[in-house]
Amino acid sequence: MSLSNPSQILLRNSELLIAKAPLFINLPEDGFIDAYLEIHKPDSINCFNTNFIDYQAITKKYCSSSNNKSVQTTFASTYQTKTCHDLAIIAFPKSKAELNFTLAMIAHCINEETKILLVGEKKCGIQSAAKLTQNILSCCQKVDAARHCLLFVGLFQPERLSDVFNLQDWFKTYHITVEGIQLTIASLPGVFSQQKLDVGTALLLSNLPNNMAGEILDFGCGAGVISCFIGKKFSETNLSLLDVSALALTSAQESLALNGLSGNVFPSNSLSDVNEHYQHVVSNPPFHQGVKTHYQASEDFLAGINKKLNKQGNITIVANSFLRYQPIMEAHIGNTRVITKDKGFTVYRAQLA
């Protein structure tokens, strides 16, 4: 795998990467760790990822018994450790609010001398890094610009190192009413649909199958809006929620609790970790990865979901009308109907024969 542009700009500043116990936050598996180990010899490397795909890739490569290079991996919404890191490299997140969340999260495991490196492509908005972090970092300066990327380095403000991180402080809650059903939704920074109900999901909730019962799969659950609505409207359902994002999964779990519901909440790379069969599958399938448009995960989901449906089971999705999901559903599931169209979105339903 070729090095990404952010990884390349990091490696051309190798003097900034010297560390005994570096922490890599949300870096992809693109060969950077191998390149890092060729020029530096840390005691250990900790890789923290909120994206399940990146976590799986790094774990598979570096954490097998035959290829252990002292690389430790963590998939979670928050990072907990007793290690004091002397370097933290953070991939600039798609959500600017997520950056300060991430910095606050690591205050317990760094010190005044820990270098904080922020790296990302310009189109992600990293130009504003110094302004965004002015209340947390001191001397946050741009040190390189290349390959359409920027690299910033800074240090924690000493008084912020003692801040106690409380996950509950970072949830944003909002209240919505759909078909007379009141919901309270909680979402962490960076989670889709934070602070409001998006148009597509609203259209989906108004056009679900009648009398839903049995096992339900909410694919790409985000903050859990769809499952919370189904759970409160249809009491005979058992909810399963999956997402690739640890931040989304934690948000969904919180949303379920706030609405007096429970469910099986788990990570999956498309359908990689789906082991059950379902009577109903519902989704507002994601097609953005970071700031990039990415369709493959949703297309793989639609092509493979027939193997996870009960006989006579159905799938209902909402998508931007320009996305050609209907032919995929027709080919792999069966007859696919357009339930409704509105405001650039279309609701489709297919039933397994």
Question: PLM features: residue spans?
Answer:
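Short beta->alpha hinge that forms the Motif I/post-I loop of the SAM-binding pocket
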Residues: 50, 121, 243-248, 293, ...
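N-terminal auxiliary segments of SAM/dcSAM-dependent transferases
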Residues: 98-178
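Conserved helix-to-beta-strand junction in the class I
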Residues: 105-110, 304-311
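Conserved SAM/SAH cofactor-binding pocket of Class I
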Residues: 2-71, 199-283
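SAM-dependent Rossmann-like transferase core, predominantly class I methyltransferases
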Residues: 4, 147-215
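Mobile active-site "lid"/loop adjacent to the S-adenosyl-L-methionine
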Residues: 246-247, 283-306
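C-terminal catalytic and target-recognition region of SAM-dependent MTase-like enzymes
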Residues: 308, 315-353
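Short SAM/SAH-binding signature in class I
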Residues: 85-91, 278-286
